[in-house]
Amino acid sequence: MDNLFSNCTLCPRACGVNRLAGKAGFCGAVGSYAEVAKTMIHHWEEPCISGKDPDRGSGTVFFAHCTLRCVYCQNQAISGRVLDASKAPNVRKMDASSLSQAFLDLQHQGAHNINLVTPTHYLPVIVPAVALACENGLQLPIVYNTSGYETAEAIHRLAGTVDIYLCDIKYWTAQTGKAYSMAPDYAGVVWAAVEEMFRQVGPCVFDEHGMLIKGIVIRHLVLPGRSYAAKKIIGRLFQRYGNNIVYSIMNQYTPLPENPGMQAFPELLNSLAPEEYEEVADYAAALDLEYAYLQEGEAISESFIPMW
């Protein structure tokens, strides 16, 4: 799959750069390897992903760089085009062999699944890494944890590799995608990507412990002043997929005024008002969703943002 790096069109930006020659596109990734910021057992994903056993959790692989530029991103230390070594000193370059071993190590630590966070731009490394790990004893579901800024073609390449899609749907309009993530086409491409995900994995399947072993979880982080958009997204999802997917409606927006560009969006300098989230939660409740997660409380503290 290295040819996918020589003219990179893995995400909707279709930069077309030759990463094998050391050229970087929008995301900043180069070479034929994956850059991994951290591997860990993660206890704070949705319960059907992380489980409730304190000795287990989701076997999470955090990849460096990102195809979006979310102005409110909590992980800017590892998501930027150029990484700051002082803030992310432990980033490792991994080929398919070393990445497959990382998956096996997480399985040995008791992970419920292998959770690939921000993986889009490393797809040509991930697919053979999963295959190699399975040849060497990996028996866990593979979770593709994505921003939703994907092409249907890239998702199609993951058929047979991914069991669970954990996918954001961030925005309802092109204007919001452009303003907050430098992605005016986000609201267009995400729906085609989700449709391909559903074509592959179908309705949710749970094991006897309530752990998801196949299916789709759609996340939506409710942003300040965007409750209308949140309801539109949830409504469209329900109209198309009904109770065949898991809905995760998040109330954890955290203002980070120190992030570059944040001052241009005063609405994002405030936490989500409780009544805004309640409006969205009430709308979801009226739909009688069978599989849905709602969050109580307020924005997460910066102390919960990982140290890289």
Kindly give the residue locations of the regions a language model identified.
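Non-cysteine beta-strand/loop elements that form the S-adenosyl-L-methionine
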Residues: 159-174, 246-252
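Conserved Radical SAM active-site core
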Residues: 27-160, 164, 173
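Auxiliary Fe-S-binding modules of radical SAM enzymes
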Residues: 1-23, 202-308
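Conserved glycine-rich "GG(E/T)P / GGGxP" loop and the immediately following alpha-helix
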Residues: 107-132, 179, 185, 195, ...
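Hydrophobic faces of well-ordered beta-strands that scaffold small-molecule active sites
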Residues: 59, 114, 142-144, 165-167, ...
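Conserved radical SAM core fold
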Residues: 79, 123, 148-151, 169-187, ...
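Anionic-ligand binding region
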Residues: 177-209
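Short glycine-enriched, charge-decorated loop/helix-capping segments at active-site entrances
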Residues: 77-91, 179-184, 262-271
